[in-house]
Amino acid sequence: MQAMARSRFLPDNFTLTLVAVVTLASLLPASGRVAHFFEGLTTVAIGLLFFLHGAKLSREAILAGITHWRLHLLVFACTFILFPVLGLALRPVLGPLVTPQLYTGVLFLCVLPATVQSAIAFTAMARGNMPAAICSASASTLLGVFITPVLVSLVVLPEGGAVASSSSLDAIGRILLQLLVPFVIGHLSRPLIGKWIQKRAAVLKFVDQGSILLVVYTAFSAAVIEGLWKQIPVSALLGLLLVCGVLLALALGLTTFMARRFGFNIEDEITIVFCGSKKSLASGIPMAKVLFASHAVGAIVLPLMLFHQMQLMVCAVLAQRYARRAATSPAPALRTAE
């Protein structure tokens, strides 16, 4: 029993693979023609990823729970307003703990959409409002395609981000082309391939995780060649862990407080906490590749990678606590109006 309890706190296979890829890029970074090959392969993998997700997501899932507008507004406010405000407000206190480029990555983390898969998975584990979680998390990802580039220009660029394009409109256009267009084509192809994809979850998982690993390898290869680890001292990495921990603690605490303050039931609270406090690695890394210069992506996504692993481990424990609470509590009264 003790070994089983301890295993919940150990990194999963993907986390270990992610660490291995970062180590590989640090020791054997891709350069020259090899780097160009991996960049092209990464672009194709990202397009395939969004194509498959578009084909997997049903129109019913998109529309399910959409009438619960109070919950969705609160989740979107936490994702796209609360996080950027926290990032800017904490900068005078937490900024000196890390390098300016790393805190630019923290601000980029703050303007990203919520993660989809883990938010829904943790909501299910905790016995929360699943239809609302599917709707909120999916809508957050789609809205992030439009909102995140605008927030990057407002929040991140004034802090010194190295952007790859000369205008946010150009960045939005490239995100639409590389991310949204494959998603829409995939969704339009759903009548033809939707059932095939649903029966092959392992394929989607492989493409999902494989595309992230490719982006991480190419991003960190470019960053290492530009001297990433020489520019970031060990003290800054330790400071970054503290920054991510403080940000996650505040996000979890404030989403819980607001859910209870506005009178949501426990199922809705679970959805708000897990959808409103999480940030998407799957969306964030491709967006960083599009929005920022290649040599800057490694440092930009490092805070996101640390925050992502931290939120997975913390939310796994939190979801189990919610599940035990739901198992021992009486069934909640039905709500007459939403």
What is the role of each PLM region?
Residues 1-338:
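Alpha-helical transmembrane segments of multi-pass small-molecule/ion transporters
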